[in-house]
Each structure stands twice: as structure tokens, then as C-alpha cells.
């Protein structure tokens, strides 16, 4: 098969003293996200999508939150590792579509910087990377500003040999 599709989803609640990092970009906000790593919920969802497309499990399998080696880990390093696994299997990113679900903070001012960061980490043309944000109209935990959820879908294409 020459193409594979992967879907990733992740959620983190607000809290703690870490800065809010989304898609590799520090986003000004009152608080960060609670997590074993740096809490970059965007990169976690993308990593899961890549691993899913390659039938390699999920980030919990590769970077368990019970392993002290990953305490405070830079999620960009984790993402690049997951992408390298795909490259090792002969696949490259075809395109990526990310949806950030959050009532706050407003994401529009940060979308382009996130796309640029993802383009660099995934060694891909920025035109193959889409990031968008939505709210839940004040419904549910994201609507109550308790946390952020992210969905990511990747299309991975066999790289020419």
C-alpha cells in the first residue's frame, strides 16, 4: 500500500506552572497544561496520528508516563522520533490536518507560527500542514476552560526509493 492514514487525539487539563506550549510554540496564557512531558497536546495528537498510520501503537507505548526519562520531555523531540520511525518504514508526510479544541486562549494569532514549527519538525512543505481551532460554544470541559483537546489526521505516503 502506498498511502496510510492516521488519526490522533489528546487532551490535557490546565494547571501547573509550565508555560503553555502548543505545536512547539509558547502561547501566552495564565497557565500551562498538566502532563508528564511538556504537555504539548498538539504534538502528542500528531505523534499518535503518525504512529497510528504506521501501525506502531501510540505515544504511551513509546514514551510511557511512568518512565522518569520522559519527565518534562520536549514534545518536539518526541514528534521527531515518531516521524523518524515513519521515515524508517519508507513513508513521508503527505499532509496533516490539526484541530485545536479550546475556549481559550484564542489560537488565531499563533496558527502560522505553529504551522512553521510543524513544517520544520516534519521536514515538510508548509502547504501540506493545516492547523485550525474551534470552541465548543462554552460546552463541556473545553468550554469551561478546564483544558484543551486536539485531533490530528495525517496522510503518509510511500517515499520514492
Curated annotation (Swiss-Prot):
InterPro entries: MECDP_synthase, MECDP_synthase_CS, MECDP_synthase_sf. Its cofactor is a divalent metal cation. The keyword Hydrolase does not apply. Pathway: Isoprenoid biosynthesis; isopentenyl diphosphate biosynthesis via DXP pathway; isopentenyl diphosphate from 1-deoxy-D-xylulose 5-phosphate: step 4/6. Its EC number is 4.6.1.12. A divalent metal cation binds at residues 10, 12, 44. It is an enzyme of class 4 (lyase). Keywords: Isoprene biosynthesis, Lyase, Metal-binding. The record marks 36, 135 as: Transition state stabilizer. It catalyses: 4-CDP-2-C-methyl-D-erythritol 2-phosphate = 2-C-methyl-D-erythritol 2,4-cyclic diphosphate + CMP. Gene3D superfamilies: 2-C-methyl-D-erythritol 2,4-cyclodiphosphate synthase (3.30.1330.50). Binds 1 divalent metal cation per subunit. 4-CDP-2-C-methyl-D-erythritol 2-phosphate binds at residues 10-12, 36-37, 58-60, 63-67, 102-108, 134-137, 141, 144. The keyword Transferase does not apply. GO terms for molecular function: 2-C-methyl-D-erythritol 2,4-cyclodiphosphate synthase activity; metal ion binding. One of its GO terms (biological process) is isopentenyl diphosphate biosynthetic process, methylerythritol 4-phosphate pathway. Homotrimer. Involved in the biosynthesis of isopentenyl diphosphate (IPP) and dimethylallyl diphosphate (DMAPP), two major building blocks of isoprenoid compounds. Catalyzes the conversion of 4-diphosphocytidyl-2-C-methyl-D-erythritol 2-phosphate (CDP-ME2P) to 2-C-methyl-D-erythritol 2,4-cyclodiphosphate (ME-CPP) with a corresponding release of cytidine 5-monophosphate (CMP). Belongs to the IspF family. This is 2-C-methyl-D-erythritol 2,4-cyclodiphosphate synthase. The gene is ispF.
Amino acid at each position: 500500500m502506498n498511502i496510510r492514514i492516521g488519526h490522533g487525539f489528546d487532551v490535557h487539563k490546565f494547571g501547573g506552572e509550565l508555560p503553555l506550549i502548543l505545536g512547539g510554540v509558547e502561547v501566552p496564557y495564565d497557565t500551562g497544561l498538566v502532563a508528564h512531558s511538556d504537555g504539548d497536546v498538539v504534538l502528542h495528537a500528531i505523534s499518535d496520528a503518525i504512529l497510528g498510520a504506521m501501525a506502531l501503537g501510540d505515544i504511551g507505548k513509546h514514551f510511557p508516563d511512568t518512565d522518569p526519562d520522559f519527565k518534562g520531555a520536549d514534545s518536539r523531540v518526541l514528534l521527531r522520533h515518531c516521524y523518524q520511525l515513519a521515515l524508517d518504514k519508507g513513508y513521508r508526510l503527505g499532509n496533516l490536518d490539526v484541530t485545536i479544541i479550546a475556549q481559550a486562549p484564542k489560537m488565531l494569532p499563533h496558527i502560522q507560527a505553529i504551522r512553521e514549527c510543524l513544517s520544520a519538525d516534519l521536514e515538510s512543505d508548509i502547504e501540506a500542514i493545516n492547523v485550525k481551532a474551534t470552541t465548543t460554544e462554552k460546552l463541556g470541559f473545553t468550554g469551561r476552560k478546564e483544558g484543551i483537546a486536539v485531533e490530528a489526521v495525517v496522510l503518509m505516503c510511500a517515499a520514492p526509493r
